[in-house]
Amino acid sequence: MTPFEEILAVRAAEAGLALTAAQIEQFAVYNRLLIAWNERMNLTALTAPEDVAVKHIIDSLTAYDAKLFAPARTLIDVGTGAGLPGIPLAVYAPKIEVTLMDALGKRVKFLTEAAAAMELRNVRCIHARAEEAARRPEHRARYDIAVSRAVARLPVLLAYTLPFVRTGGTLLALKGRAYAAEQAEGKRAAEILGGGAISARPVRLPGLDDVRAILAVTKERPTPKGYPRRTGLPERAPLK
């Protein structure tokens, strides 16, 4: 094993994650490509082996919930950036078809190369803005699960993501230590966009003291036709 693979194996075990040797090898491929591409473009500020293993990969996998993922068939990662949390979830839940969506073409090129090198046959990469893609019939209300990490505060994030989720599906937002404030802020937006109550599942990462959380919103009814609003408006004028 390489030093990165050893760190990942140890930290994953500490987090209660059962990674296979093949999955660890896939993540090693991702790590190598992330480091190489990061020299050409700004994908992440965190490139040390411990940081990639814990703050990127294991953090992404905290979104996994067996009861939710077992029956799911489709997942979209909105504003995926460097493929987080979508790529780790695609590795860990290979039966789910994962769509990685990002507005920056260069990042989509990285994602496409990474998915191919990791032999992730359950991943497709799309270059699009969420506000525009969510109005297309092939994406609107088509996904069992939507995930997002480090994109926007919850009222804005809900506007970007809930239109993609089918009725009965779930949005999972990976949030930091201020998650309780965002949970309260997002209540009205969730109601407007067809979501139910916002639940919080606190999580801890191995080796770190801070508490994070997965905020979950179940889609209870269709998102009104007027949403998402035109490009840029969800962020400039969040729903309150």
Locations of regions flagged by a protein language model:
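Short strand-turn motif at the edge of the Rossmann-like AdoMet-binding core
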Residues: 103, 151, 174-178, 202
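Short loop/edge segments at beta-strand edges and connector loops
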Residues: 21, 47, 127-129, 199-201
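Conserved beta-strand segments of alpha/beta enzyme cores
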Residues: 97, 122-124, 170, 196-199
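Short glycine-dipeptide loop
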Residues: 165-172
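Class I SAM-dependent transferase core
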Residues: 1-76, 106-123, 231
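SAM/dcSAM-binding transferase cores
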Residues: 184-240
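Short alpha-helix immediately C-terminal to the canonical SAM-binding loop
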Residues: 107-109, 179, 183
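Conserved SAM/SAH cofactor-binding pocket of Class I
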Residues: 58-152, 158-161
